[in-house]
């Protein structure tokens, strides 16, 4: 027999959404400002209503059942529409509005000043919180700690960072694609040699530790060729690798996205860019789609929609 929503306490749906986000009774209780016991009682009521366990315990926390997974997007959309209704009287002039972004650096630094100006023009009382993109950023989006992420993914078939590998709860839009190139100081001895794979591998390299990994698609392509680069230094950010490659008498090579030319121009780094010495099919595996990422529950959030369009317009020249 079909159940009527009039017999369901709608507060239970908020509890259900937070349990899906947090995968923890304790964390959901903290966000609701109630005790874990109260959340457990709410979960028991939800299980009775849906006649399904909804979540089972696992080593990583609460694991959703197939029914719960199938309801996630509908639940998020329902909660989003509820929030829009509640915001109607005052959302035109929000106070205390906060924009929380996680972005690859220096990608965001290129346009941060322009982006902040547009935000403050529209929302004068807003605050902006920017964090570096790292291994936890996708989970932070899922947890609701980040509104939008802006980062590069990978194209190599064996990569863990493919767009097709993103969690089902994450929506995305590719703003532009980039092929990395090799950055070296203007008086580097490699510039006096024939630029080929042997020259590229003859010199020591700076690697970027990306989402807890020191290797990426470049190393996969080299492995397919039976070759390997010498990694002399591992750094967390592209701008650090560019800074080190630009130092006098430094033989280090940095491999970084082509868009870094904008960053280099801003900071007047004495660097030259050379193409990676690979054929077209190998270059294709190294393409980096730079992508906006957000949770599906925010797909119709006016603040997030406006922010997505603003970032998209700012980076249109790089497409």
Curated annotation (Swiss-Prot):
Domain of life: Bacteria
Family: Belongs to the LysR transcriptional regulatory family.
Residue ranges for the DNA-binding region feature of this UniProt entry: 25-44
Stretches assigned to the HTH lysR-type domain: 8-65
Keyword set, alphabetical order: DNA-binding, Transcription, Transcription regulation
CDD domains the UniProt entry points to: PBP2_Nitroaromatics_like
Protein name per its UniProtKB record: HTH-type transcriptional regulator YidZ
Function: Involved in anaerobic NO protection.
Lineage, broadest ranks: Bacteria, Pseudomonadati, Pseudomonadota, Gammaproteobacteria, Enterobacterales
GO MF entries: DNA binding; DNA-binding transcription factor activity
Gene3D superfamilies linked to this entry: Periplasmic binding protein-like II, Winged helix-like DNA-binding domain superfamily/Winged helix DNA-binding domain
InterPro entries xref list: LysR-type_TF (IPR050389), LysR_subst-bd (IPR005119), Tscrpt_reg_HTH_LysR (IPR000847), Tscrpt_reg_YidZ (IPR023746), WH-like_DNA-bd_sf (IPR036388), WH_DNA-bd_sf (IPR036390), YidZ_PBP2 (IPR037402)
PANTHER family referenced in this protein's UniProt entry, alphabetically: HTH-TYPE TRANSCRIPTIONAL REGULATOR LEUO-RELATED (PTHR30118), HTH-TYPE TRANSCRIPTIONAL REGULATOR YIDZ (PTHR30118:SF11)
Presence of keyword Plastid: no
Pfam families: HTH_1, LysR_substrate
